[in-house]
């Protein structure tokens, strides 16, 4: 039957990508339908019960700055919070949280059910409705047809998923859930470039059978407890719990080696490539044979369960080998396994067949987000889902697509890497992937993106008002510090010596003093008995005040570096965003080698910047391409008309501070 209501956007899948996509589309005012095979698993954490980490936490903050749900749900469900790299520079500091699976999922479900313009429907999707070169809807397994102007596919590991435990295997999207076999077949019929990838998960352990007295305790940060969302509050957090640390040993490694003849990875049963940066324990033992021990983190799954996640022993070895290797580790000698570990193979589609909006180049209105694009991780999925949801909504509302640039957001880095370079293994985000990471910090994600989000229609009034209060306070106080001066006459020598190590010898602004190593905002404001501080409090709220002070300190201390990077961005941006015509035939570009023209015709980059990052496309080839465009008057700046955030001033030094 044809459902009587037509939607603007249909989102297929209710994981981290799908929920962010549906929420974003609905926030923009698009009539949105979220189709999931099981409403009870919306927002489910299928693997590790954690959010964030190096690079990943940056993505979560960006999703939050654009009005997304992941950070807020983590604040409601987080049972341990830590700031990683806290002793290092601000560019690489990152938030990580352990989450109670149930509380996190409950928060996501509540956000979905309370979101205007969003409908939920429980049915697996078996088919897409395609007319010519555009998608017009989706068909469920019982034949219900839903029509829409755009469809976002966020199928995770469900596309023709196959689960492996030892040499036994069976179809499944994850443990306990069916695979999307029919949908996978339909996508293959559409001739989209496709491959197979693999990921895995460790066995889960009953905490009542763990001897914690033999383990090293790893508490979270407690003074203060961090928050993930820019609107988050520490009092939102439930009870905080520690994690625990144990290690593998030579006996563990011998047990693993003895089982490799029954490993689906090492007997050729699994053909998909696994994640390099989250390898299985058997892969670790094989690749790092010289190491006699690996650290294993025992992470609580929640407040109302005894289940623990042993982070570091993802495996597809036979269950008897899993049991033996767990029992070989200190503190786990009597451990009971609640669920076996397994590997899962699944279909993904080459992201080079996508536009930077995450719309497929071949089928108008069809968007992909998450693991279907070859990524791994909740955070990468959520970020893609948010972007796909925004652009599906804009497509349905007949507005121009939007994607942040590499110098605007880690989300921009993620998408650009995917659509220009593709993947040969599951892709995960690191700070090292971003060339402008000093400007792309966790702490300034809102300064970079919230105004753009407001233009896009995904940032509500509450977030917008809070953002403006913070931005205005940072701006006013930074200006005050730059225009307030102290001299040898007005700053007593003993006070200057206490703060700076010696008296000052000429006039300094407070900003110049703050720029010195080891000098804090509070230290500068405390000079002359506090007279150098602001005349009235920057904020009544202690958490907001801390965020404002952090922004001010980083902006002033790193001003020179930030301005230098802004200059580099401006120089590189001269040609970076020059759009390439849709119908250009690269074999007609004089001087291009056959190999380069073939690659450009195959991957169809949208901009000169994207073309320059395709493997094998040389700087000389880019120069020839620029000459070709100039002669024919074809190139124009991407987003030079009305795309939100297109103005280069979005990334000025002032904005980055």
Curated annotation (Swiss-Prot):
Keyword Isomerase: no
Function per UniProt: NAD-binding protein involved in the addition of a carboxymethylaminomethyl (cmnm) group at the wobble position (U34) of certain tRNAs, forming tRNA-cmnm(5)s(2)U34.
Stated name of the protein: tRNA uridine 5-carboxymethylaminomethyl modification enzyme MnmG
Entries under Gene3D superfamilies matching the protein: FAD/NAD(P)-binding domain, GidA associated domain, C-terminal subdomain, tRNA uridine 5-carboxymethylaminomethyl modification enzyme MnmG/GidA
Family annotation (InterPro entries): FAD/NAD-bd_sf, GIDA_C_N, MnmG, MnmG-rel, MnmG-rel_CS, MnmG_C, MnmG_C_subdom, MnmG_C_subdom_sf
GO cellular component: cytosol
Organism: Burkholderia thailandensis (strain ATCC 700388 / DSM 13276 / CCUG 48851 / CIP 106301 / E264)
Subunit structure as annotated in this protein's UniProt entry: Homodimer. Heterotetramer of two MnmE and two MnmG subunits.
Any one GO molecular-function label of the UniProt entry: flavin adenine dinucleotide binding
PROSITE patterns (alphabetical): GIDA_1, GIDA_2
SUPFAM superfamilies: FAD/NAD(P)-binding domain
Residues that coordinate or bind NAD(+): 274-288
HAMAP family hit by this protein: MnmG_GidA
UniProt keyword Lipoprotein, yes or no: no
PANTHER family for the chain: GLUCOSE INHIBITED DIVISION PROTEIN A, PROTEIN MTO1 HOMOLOG, MITOCHONDRIAL
Superkingdom of origin organism: Bacteria
Family in the record: Belongs to the MnmG family.
Region of interest called Disordered, as start-end residue ranges on this chain: 635-657
Subcellular location: Cytoplasm
Residues binding FAD, per UniProt: 13-18
Cofactor(s) this protein cannot do without: FAD
Record's keyword terms, sorted: Cytoplasm, FAD, Flavoprotein, NAD, tRNA processing
